[in-house]
From Swiss-Prot:
It is an enzyme of class 2 (transferase). It catalyses: UDP-N-acetyl-alpha-D-muramoyl-L-alanyl-gamma-D-glutamyl-L-lysyl-D-alanyl-D-alanine + di-trans,octa-cis-undecaprenyl phosphate = Mur2Ac(oyl-L-Ala-gamma-D-Glu-L-Lys-D-Ala-D-Ala)-di-trans,octa-cis-undecaprenyl diphosphate + UMP. Catalyzes the initial step of the lipid cycle reactions in the biosynthesis of the cell wall peptidoglycan: transfers peptidoglycan precursor phospho-MurNAc-pentapeptide from UDP-MurNAc-pentapeptide onto the lipid carrier undecaprenyl phosphate, yielding undecaprenyl-pyrophosphoryl-MurNAc-pentapeptide, known as lipid I. This is Phospho-N-acetylmuramoyl-pentapeptide-transferase. One of its GO terms (molecular function) is metal ion binding.
Length: 336
């Protein structure tokens, strides 16, 4: 445990040192920054804020994880197979996000990768994770509240759905200052507790390291944000959470621990479906939420959508509290 804490502190310090240099480089090169939703007017002032900050905390987390995982394995208390499985997912999804951000920022291609291109790359990455790290482990049953449902090779489709789905869910959640970074920290702390109780110290190590790196990033990402993580960070973090839940054989827990991401994604899907349905029935499309993902709905009028506008800090606090509450419920189900 001491080794994990030390590694987490190192990741925090390195990220805090590296991010200002990344921001300075970004500004010196006059690289185009983040584009904002015009519908949320309080965000317009953020236009041009450096993005792709996830590149920094991912590089730090991956390097520190690699070094300390090797140290841990030499002490005969670590499993490099599980560690490399999770880290490979983080790396590959980070590369996909980096490519998407690069096209948006450096090539001035507004949408970056097309949805078809991004989904294809994510599916390929998910398949690599399954065939290289999941299939050799012999895992073919889904844990549903402690009951294992044997699905055989259909587990491959579940892995794809889980990893791709949550990578995009965290990506959707990353819409206001600090929301995604601390939401993921809350999720990782919860999985850290689960890993500790399972004596999976190899997984605990990389969890603590990513927590340290994310907290270092949050120093510059809280409101008013000096840098955003970009798709490079959010896609990698979502995939990491999915991979951890699979590695710990606690797949179902991510529906609770990741409730905020699930709800954010569901709000978008419901909004689109309801708009299309009402337009087909009445000729006029109607909306359930003021704007999606859900955090924008809160910004524009609170929970009801009809109240006063919420500040980003208030939205953050509300959704972080939900994340903590759902994580506590998960731990209660597991251990009480």
């Amino acid at each position: 445990m001491f080794l994990s804490i030390m590694a987490g502190v190192i990741a925090f310090v390195l990220t805090v040192i590296a991010i200002p240099r990344f921001i300075k480089f970004y500004q010196l090169k006059k690289i185009g920054g983040q584009q904002m939703h015009e519908d949320v007017k309080q965000h317009l002032a953020k236009a041009g804020t450096p993005t792709m900050g996830g590149t920094v905390f991912l590089i730090v987390a991956l390097l520190v994880s690699l070094i300390f995982s090797i140290i841990l394995s030499k002490e005969n208390s670590g499993n490099l197979g599980a560690t490399f499985g999770i880290l490979s997912v983080v790396l590959i999804y980070g590369i996909i996000g980096f490519l998407d951000d690069f096209l948006k920022i450096f090539k001035q291609i507004n949408e970056g990768l097309t949805p078809k291109q991004k989904m294809s790359l994510q599916l390929i990455a998910g398949l690599i994770f399954y065939f290289v790290h999941v299939l050799p482990s012999g895992t073919s049953a889904i844990n549903i509240f402690g009951f294992y449902l044997e699905v055989g090779y259909l587990y491959a489709f579940f892995v794809l759905f889980w990893v791709v789905g949550f990578s995009n869910a965290v990506n959707l959640t990353d819409g206001i200052d600090g929301l995604a970074s601390i939401s993921v920290v809350i999720s990782l702390i919860t999985y850290g507790i689960i890993a500790y109780n399972q004596t999976q110290f190899d997984i605990l190590l990389i969890i603590v390291i990513m927590i340290g790196a994310l907290l270092g990033f949050f120093v510059f990402n809280h409101k008013p944000a000096k840098v955003f993580m970009g798709d490079v960070g959010s896609l990698a973090l979502g995939a990491m959470l999915a991979a951890i839940s699979i590695a710990l054989r606690q797949e179902w827990t991510l529906l609770f621990i990741g409730f905020v991401y699930v709800f954010e994604t569901s709000s978008v899907m419901l909004q689109v479906a309801y708009f299309k349905y009402t337009k087909k029935k009445t000729g006029v499309g109607k909306r359930i939420f003021r704007m999606t993902p859900f955090h924008h709905h809160l910004e524009l009028g609170g929970v009801s959508g009809k109240g006063n506008k919420w500040s980003e800090w208030k939205v953050d606090a509300f959704l972080w509290a939900i994340g903590i509450f759902m994580s506590a419920i998960t731990l209660a189900i597991l251990y009480l």
